[in-house]
Every structure is written in C-alpha cells, then in structure tokens.
From Swiss-Prot:
Regulation: induction: Up-regulated by beta3-adrenergic stimulation, starvation, glucocorticoids and leptin.
Assembly and oligomerization: Interacts with HAX1; the interaction is direct and calcium-dependent.
Protein name per UniProt: Putative mitochondrial transporter UCP3
GO molecular function: oxidative phosphorylation uncoupler activity; proton transmembrane transporter activity
Gene: UCP3
Length: 312
C-alpha cells in the first residue's frame, strides 16, 4: 500500500497475510449482524421462502436484526460466524495480503507509480485467487445466515455445526456443492476487490500526495469509507445473484444466469439492489474497521521486525 516512508522496513509476505487475515476477522466480528441482515433481505421474495415469509417479514436493516432476535434468539444474527472467520483467514489474507506483490508484477519495469489499469488487474487477480481457495467457507456461511429457525428447538436445524455443514453438503450435493456459485462469486469478488482495494489505494495516495491528511487514522478512515461505498454500488447486483444461487436447493436454478433471469422476471430489476442499505452499512463499516486495523497491525509488526534487525 502507499504511504510508507523510505526508511520504513517493508512488511514481509507473512506479515501481510497474518495482518490482513486477522484484521478481516476482527472486522467480521464487529459487522457480522449487518451481513446476516443483508443475506436475509436479499433472499426475501424467493419462491422457496414464500411459506416462511408468511410468518416472518423483514423491513430494513435494524428491523431485520430485531426480528431475528425476537423470533430466533439473540445469537441468530451471528449464524455462520465460524465459517465467516474461516473464510476471512483464507480469503482476505490472499486478496489483500497479495495485492501489493501482484501490483508490482503488473507494473512495468522503470515505472515510478502503478497505473490505474495495473491496480485494477491486481485487484481482479487477487480477488479471483481468493475465491478459489475460500469458496466452500462462503457457501457454508451463506447457508447458515439464510436458515430460519423459529423457536428454541434444534430439531429443525439442517446442520448441527460448521463441520457438519461441510460434510452434509458434500454428501447430499457432492463435492461440487461446496463450490456452488463459484463463477458469480469470482465475478463478485473481482469487482469488489477492484472497487475496494484499488479505491482505498488511490484515495490514500491522493490524500497523502496533496498533503490533505497524514498517514494516520483520519486518512485510513476516509479512504476505507470511500472504498466501501464504491464496492457496494458496483457489486450489489452480482452479490444478490451469488447469495441466492449459493443458498438455493438443487434444481431451483440451472445456472447463475438462470437465477438472474428469474429474478428480473419475477421481481423486476430492483431485485438486484435488495439489501443495498445493509450491504453499504456492512461494507462501509467493515472496510473502516479492517483497513484501520490492518494498517496498525502492519505498523506494529514492522516495528517489531525493525527491533529484531537493529536491537540497539
């Protein structure tokens, strides 16, 4: 990322991986209820949810969370958290931790700065690579977030836990079931990574170049918030298709394209922006928490590295 002084020790690959994964997990802990609310709003209106929808209707972000707490218990907004943390450790560490390295690969030799095209290519590449590794965890996370359990009984729960979900999906739908929705997810995360990481990179660079802010919390906050807004605007349509397709039972949709066509036919084009508000609240707050934490972790780990190399 931009903003490091020449005298600073550049972070190693291990520092970037650990810092990005840890910061993303912390951000998930803070914002996970917003993500769950987004998933519930995105799948509301599907054919398979009609019967349940007669009992439960979600209205707005806060209303969705309060309805879940009232009907399913206080822990329900955190359904799928374990899979979510597994996802971030394997996902964010790649898409964010590898971004600088891939950007350097695409940057022509002798160039002082990376162009916008170079940054977009790097964002698309690391986003797609991350999905390849983390897709099963994303499928399980979405299944848990989408499942509705009315009452305290566990008898209506399809999965008893995260590991049981992996086993059950593989047994009932085949190993391919764990990779369901990989194509729309690659599209979604390539777009999100470009809008998120590239926007953060450019905003931070410009704020520092024009001396509007120093390389500290306010700069990181503004850059991260702008990145979250851009990511939400461009990724919401793909995100809705991804969520519905991954949550669907076998046979409901033939492909992500079929899912998209049925959405337009049954609910109109506005269905692509269902759950936009929680998506923005979640991505905006997630980006702020993640990037601020990531910058501080990198700074702390680099100081430790400098002390090790020159203890006196």
């Amino acid at each position: 990322m931009v903003g490091l002084k020449p005298s600073d020790v550049p972070p190693t690959m291990a520092v970037k991986f650990l810092g990005a994964g840890t910061a993303a997990c912390f951000a998930d802990l803070v914002t996970f209820p917003l993500d769950t609310a987004k998933v519930r709003l995105q799948i509301q209106g599907e054919n398979q949810a009609v019967q349940t929808a007669r009992l439960v209707q979600y209205r707005g972000v806060l209303g969705t969370i309060l309805t879940m707490v009232r009907t399913e218990g206080p822990c329900s907004p955190y359904n799928g958290l374990v899979a979510g943390l597994q996802r971030q450790m394997s996902f964010a560490s790649i898409r964010i931790g590898l971004y600088d390295s891939v950007k350097q690969v695409y940057t022509p030799k002798g160039a002082d700065n990376s162009s916008l095209t170079t940054r977009i290519l790097a964002g698309c590449t690391t986003g797609a690579m991350a999905v390849t590794c983390a897709q099963p965890t994303d499928v399980v996370k979405v299944r848990f977030q989408a499942s509705i359990h009315l009452g305290p009984s566990r008898s209506d729960r399809k999965y008893s836990g995260t590991m049981d979900a992996y086993r059950t999906i593989a047994r009932e739908e085949g190993v391919r079931g764990l990779w369901k929705g990989t194509l729309p997810n690659i599209m979604r995360n390539a777009i999100v990574n470009c809008a998120e990481v590239v926007t953060y990179d450019i905003l931070k660079e410009k704020l520092l170049d024009y001396h509007l802010l120093t390389d500290n919390f306010p700069c990181h906050f503004v850059s991260a918030f702008g990145a979250g807004f851009c990511a939400t605007v461009v990724a919401s349509p793909v995100d809705v298709v991804k969520t519905r397709y991954m949550n669907s039972p076998p046979g409901q949709y033939f492909s992500p394209l079929d899912c998209m066509i049925k959405m337009v036919a049954q609910e109109g084009p506005t269905a692509f922006y269902k759950g936009f508000t929680p998506s923005f609240l979640r991505l905006g707050s997630w980006n702020v928490v993640m990037f601020v934490t990531y910058e501080q972790l990198k700074r702390a780990l680099m100081k430790v590295q400098m002390l090790r190399e020159s203890p006196f």
